Amino acid sequence: MFAKKIRELRNKKGLSQEKLARLANVSFITIVKIESGESKHPTIQTMAGISRALEISLDELIKDIQLRKK
C-alpha cells in the first residue's frame, strides 16, 4: 500500500510528517492524508516531491502500485 510505504520510508529517514511536508513542498495535511489512506490518489507533482524528499526515484516509490494494478 502506498500509504504504508511512504510512512515506512519517512520513518527510516528519521523524518517527521512535518519535515517531510517541508522537504516535499506540500502541506502537512497532505502528508497526513496520504499516510492515513484518506488521500488515495495524490497528484504526480505531490508524489514527485515526496520521492525527492525521501531521496528515491519516483519509479521506486510507485512501483508497488503499478504491480498491483496488473
Regions found by a protein language model. Give the residues of each.
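Residue-level detection of the helix-turn-helix DNA-binding "recognition helix"
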Residues: N11, N25, S36, Q66
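Conserved hydrophobic/aromatic packing and binding residues within compact polymer-binding modules
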Residues: I6, L20, I31-I34, L61
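Short, basic-rich loop-to-helix N-cap that marks the start of a DNA-contacting helix
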Residues: S39-G49
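Short, charged recognition helix plus adjacent turn
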Residues: K33, K40, R52, E60-K70
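Conserved amphipathic alpha-helical interaction elements at protein-protein interfaces in regulatory
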Residues: K12, A53-I56
